[in-house]
């Protein structure tokens, strides 16, 4: 029996050892954090942001947002409010409250309100300073273990003071969130925490459970209800009596919201924080309290210029009849790296982390999508050139789709350059139909445009998409056009460092070739035409080379436009500008005459001119493999083929065009040549005895000037035209019947003569006509 009990004991011991080992493994105890009092006692862990030159631009949730206060300065009724709301047995337990864990469920069920959680104030302080928000058994066990240790290292009052100075209370108005009770009192009541009333203290104790959900600014009714629950709990726990509780519950919220100092570059900073949260997989609270040093790509001068332009109402369309302002956004990227150098998310910046239209909206880009979808595919995949011809005529495609040009005018056979620079819808859709919508989709996606599976129709050629694009995404898609075909992801942040100096993130600087260098140049060169004389010609106001494209999206079932765009490129900078209403409808639409070529293009031009030191970098570099050639515009217009200009081609018809090596035209234009000499001139007398001359017309566009010489007098007596090979005849009715005359033909360039320029070929050899001798018919002469 003893032997049996011995083995049972051994078995139980082994099981206990194995169970303990399993528990240690499950809770990952060897990797638990150790208590670090420095994190609690030195809690100024602000996030610091730097610009592209490593100059500090903002300190978030740092000294100016958290104001430390000693516990003895906090009124007892305020301390009691936090104890009633968060940990009524705070001064009785040793870090964890075993009784409370069991009683919490009953208390919550009885009150119908989550008046208490299971975590003590000590545990909450540990979570705020040592742990993440991860919900796991290991994290909860660490929290309890560290709370027990903390209670041995710090007094209850020290723990409560640290908690009140660290906990987050949310934000108000245009300010960032308040950290610590002193900052919260200043934010919501414009007074020190030492002056808080019972009702005010209870409100602050109420909001920390969910600073956004119980925000007295955004959700005053919920905040009031939660405050009154805290006041009721104070009475139940004996901190105040029932009459005091009821009296305080009758008081209104009585907020006095502070106008917190406006931080500079608000839109840009918001974008940086959002990107940091995504890169590090952290919450906003963790970023703002973690002591991170965030190095951005901000160009402070460019951002300041953009902000100044957005403060001028004359730069934007008129508001709707009900006063709702038209909104706008701007993004500027470094062409080489994709770094965001400036960003504006709306007309006014009046709330931290509000809707950032530069990054968060998705709108139809309209014709602004054409260069990075249809034309990119045509040039890079199919070998189209700026001089290639496409038909600009109204067609009906599968499904009854019948796109039309703005204004209802069509131009027949046009070059790709003309179709893109003049934003001809019919020509663009016909081009997309030729090359195939799958190829168009492939190139749009290659340039970073996210498409839905439903975006597989010809309407995509005109920028009709299921989801739409943000100004940032559209600017990013244009990046390869300005950067020789290389794409890199647009980014705000260059590097993030932890408070201890560890590099948490470094932008990889990766680039990807999405277009050939030659294709990118041809595309941006065509967009230079759009910016100088086409739909985006307002960009020419910069005074330096710019390429660009506009976009206008109609309302559809109502009059007016819903979105207007301009994207502008220089060799160093890409700028995207959007304008429209946040919630477009029949009453909130831009007027029909307000398109992308207006306000957005002018704003983009002003912005680029303001940052000329950055944006002005001369011409886009002609890459190897591309050749410039002087071609005849008339031949392109009438013969629909690129032919070389001649020395006679008028300046207004001389076009500098670009061609890949091997595709440069070799033939010259037939329109601007010295006329050929007539070689078959004949002359005789007509039946009436008048000089009659005959010759063959040799070419189009030539005036054949008939020259007559009688004795010493030489004069032009007539001008004839004819088709090549046609026999031309002229009877000189004005000739004298008794004088000999000589006739010749002077070929004259018809078009040049009409333009005021005399260009002739060699005069033909003269032929003579003798008059009939009188009475010669009697003698057979």
State where each predicted segment sits:
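Soluble, non-transmembrane domains of envelope/secretory-pathway proteins that act on or interact
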Residues: 1, 547, 551-781
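Juxtamembrane regions of bacterial inner-membrane/periplasmic proteins
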Residues: 2-311, 315, 339-340, 393
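A short, well-structured edge-of-sheet supersecondary motif
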Residues: 46-57, 74, 294, 323-351, ...
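Active-site SXXK
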Residues: 81-83, 234, 306, 337-338, ...
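Short, well-structured active-site flanking segments
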Residues: 91-101, 178-179, 241-246, 355, ...
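Conserved catalytic neighborhood of penicillin-recognizing serine enzymes
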Residues: 110-134, 191, 261-264, 383-440, ...
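A penicillin-recognizing enzyme superfamily signal
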Residues: 296-320, 330-332, 343, 350-359, ...
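Mid-domain, small-residue-enriched loop/turn segments at the edges of structured enzyme/sensor domains
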Residues: 401-405, 436-476, 489
